[in-house]
């Protein structure tokens, strides 16, 4: 793959879409991970003065916030920090008492989505989503959370290719080398939670063989079980 050309084409595609719909700028969450960093760098190339990154800690890992700040500084990105921790905690105390770890954790990206759309509507900006093709295949995301966006620039780019795109965009090495994580809880990583590496997943998505039968079956199962996330809600036809 010619990563330089892909990066140039990607930036142009995003810019063309923004022009087509009359967007005044872009807004997105800046999580401290590589996907949001790539989104931020693309946004800055299209709208150098009208790109806003929201850092939205929500009972989050401090290191992620620090990394998000470093990325913003590296690309000279305008940012706004909105701490959603107290909002999350109040919801937990008042309404959501279940000990289901995933159900509780998924509230966080949904709060962030709500915050992003408040500012997007106020500013006339489009919300950029950070989902990549590897996550999209499994829909390793929160429905109506981080998957809620107006445009998904990297949704057709596999995770292993995202690292190369990041290099083309001039992002700092620390973010390229950081272990992918949704930051849902301390110590959580994508690959630990999935049970296989992105290299294995991407090879399978490309049509290559997966060495272990159990992993292939798990990927197939996750793809099937998450199919409802990749389509609009079904409607009864009269």
Whereabouts are the PLM-identified features?
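A short, conserved alpha-helix within the catalytic core of class I
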Residues: 113
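ATP/NTP-dependent adenylation/nucleotidyl-transfer catalytic domains that generate, transfer
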Residues: 3-26, 41-45, 49-52, 59-60, ...
